[in-house]
Amino acid sequence: QKRESKIMDHGKKLIKDAIKDGFIIRVYYEDDYEPAYVGTNLSKAWDDATACDCSSIEFFKKDDQNNITEHGSAFLVHGNSPEETVADYTIGGYAEIWDNRQQA
């Protein structure tokens, strides 16, 4: 029981690593079309990502001209164990690359 709390929730780790890798995060509650949060603050993003049972996270970058490049999304389910929070993600996006790094 004690050991389990040491494992950082994979959803949180995904957001943390994405921010570290230069991504901006969009957090959506379950079926909302408007993001609950957009930015690079880990604690704010995680607060919104955990405000309901399921949430979606999108990763994007902006260049100097404010052009946005999308880098896919991930779907979080918070009832799952910490290693299983990231329930799904877009193929070829940041979350897939991230997930492959976790397995390595």
Locate the predicted segments by residue.
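Negatively charged, low-complexity tracts enriched in Asp/Glu with abundant Ser/Thr
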Residues: 2-45
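Acidic, low-complexity, intrinsically disordered interaction modules
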Residues: 28-104
